[in-house]
Amino acid sequence: MAFKQVYNPYFDQDGEVKTFSFNGKKLTALYLYREHDQEIGFKENPLLKPLVFTWKKPIYTCFNMVNVPYELEIFFFNADKKIIGSAVMEKFSQKQYCPKEKIQFALERIKT
């Protein structure tokens, strides 16, 4: 998998960020609080770059695809950046995916 720099039009790129390495590539992970930022993702990301979501501490959260017009692969990581789950999310799906463990990071990319 090839990953490029994360893109997020809603947040100041010079704000609070972390470096995130996955599969030999470095990404910039922005702190996002999903309950307030449901529409982030790929909506205004014309290059469809992968996105990394992270939180200040591990949380239980769920993901859905109600407003997303792409099929996505999503990877869930613990605080040690080890994969603890993944899912393929169908576009405009009403289904929710809720990891059984607390997650610290989630990486979303367009399914190819």
How would you name each of these model-derived features?
Residues 2-112:
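Compact, glycine-rich, soluble single-domain proteins
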